[in-house]
Curated annotation (Swiss-Prot):
One of its GO terms (molecular function) is aspartate carbamoyltransferase activity. Its EC number is 2.1.3.2. The gene is pyrB. It holds the Pfam family OTCace. This is Aspartate carbamoyltransferase catalytic subunit. It comes from Flavobacterium psychrophilum (strain ATCC 49511 / DSM 21280 / CIP 103535 / JIP02/86). Pathway: Pyrimidine metabolism; UMP biosynthesis via de novo pathway; (S)-dihydroorotate from bicarbonate: step 2/3. Belongs to the aspartate/ornithine carbamoyltransferase superfamily. ATCase family. HAMAP family: Asp_carb_tr (MF_00001).
């Protein structure tokens, strides 16, 4: 059996193209499984997984839990807001206490960039990063690339533009890493204040004009503005942002070609994307959500096989 080159999924930065393709091949199998009348397999009956979320989540948390249960793993969910973390307990102490209950794998979301890497060096368990601050969100990048592969046949040679708040987005960085490793060309588009200074060092060009970006690309991944991470004003108003960087049906229909529309969610309808675009036939937003379960099943299964 093929194996991942890593024991944890800490970020796309730490895995290679073969790892990504192995996840995709495994996800293909699980996608077939979850479309059966009985959507469950007994693969991980002897594995216990803890979902530890220090930040709010809807899609990612539900997707991971569903993936784990469809693999027949035992699952425990930990909410930091109602735990001893509020009493001053450290991250390592919290996780080690959970691991002492014979937990094999930890899926963690944390507000601090690098939290998953730090944890992997200080506890004995397989760690899956479900998002660490504005750093990485590896499973989102994997499911995004998987969806592009499903829609367009391959990722290599495709042109993808990521539009919006690149500076505060963990999705953007993980997508850049994964798409480049798979042979795609990536550009970003957004207000200058929301483009990180290091972006061109990653081999990514900046296109400040949304129309030009859309005319260039095969796929547009629309990101919301991360208002919860904004400590100052990065643009004059939400209305002006929507006028400059929001994708509406008029703009989409005026292009001389058909492009694929993506969004990692949650959507701020009427800001970065209008409802008639988000719900159009060119949109694969719900496909991304569906594929997230199969991709996360693949990641968990492949990491668990290394524990065994």
């Amino acid at each position: 059996m093929k194996e991942l080159s890593v024991n944890n999924l800490l970020g796309i930065k730490y895995i290679n193209e073969n790892d990504i393709n192995l996840v995709f091949e495994t996800a293909d199998h699980f996608k077939e499984v979850i479309n059966r009348p009985i959507k469950k397999v007994p693969s991980l009956r002897d594995i216990t997984i803890a979902n530890i979320f220090f930040e709010n989540s809807t899609r990612t948390k539900l997707s991971f839990e569903l993936a784990q249960k469809r693999l027949s793993a035992d699952v425990i969910n930990f909410a930091a807001s109602s735990s001893s973390v509020t009493k001053g307990e450290t991250l390592v102490d919290t996780v080690n206490n959970i691991l002492s209950m014979k937990v094999d794998m930890v899926v963690m979301r944390h507000a601090s960039p690098g939290a998953a890497v730090f944890l992997s060096k200080n506890v004995k368990a397989s760690i899956v990063n479900a998002g660490d601050g504005a750093h990485e969100h590896p499973t989102q990048a994997l499911l995004d690339a998987y969806t592009i592969r499903e829609k367009l046949g391959d990722v290599a040679g495709k042109k993808i533009v990521i539009v919006g708040d690149i500076l505060h987005s963990r999705v953007a960085l993980s997508n850049i890493y994964s798409l480049q490793k798979l042979g795609a060309e990536v550009r970003v588009c957004g207000p200058k204040t929301l483009i990180p200074k290091y972006i061109e060092a990653l081999g990514v060009k900046v296109e400040p004009n949304l129309r030009k970006a859309l005319e260039w690309c095969d796929v547009a991944n629309m990101l919301r503005v991360q208002n919860e991470r904004l400590d100052i004003s990065y643009f004059p108003s939400t209305r002006e942002y929507a006028m400059q960087y929001g994708l509406d049906k008029n703009l989409l229909d005026s292009l001389n070609k058909e492009i694929v529309i993506m969004h990692p969610g949650p959507i701020n309808r009427g800001v970065e994307i209008t409802s008639d675009v988000a719900d159009s036939r060119q949109s694969v937003i719900l496909n991304q959500v569906e594929n997230g379960v199969a991709v996360r099943m693949a990641v968990i299964y492949l990491l668990a096989s290394k524990i065994k």
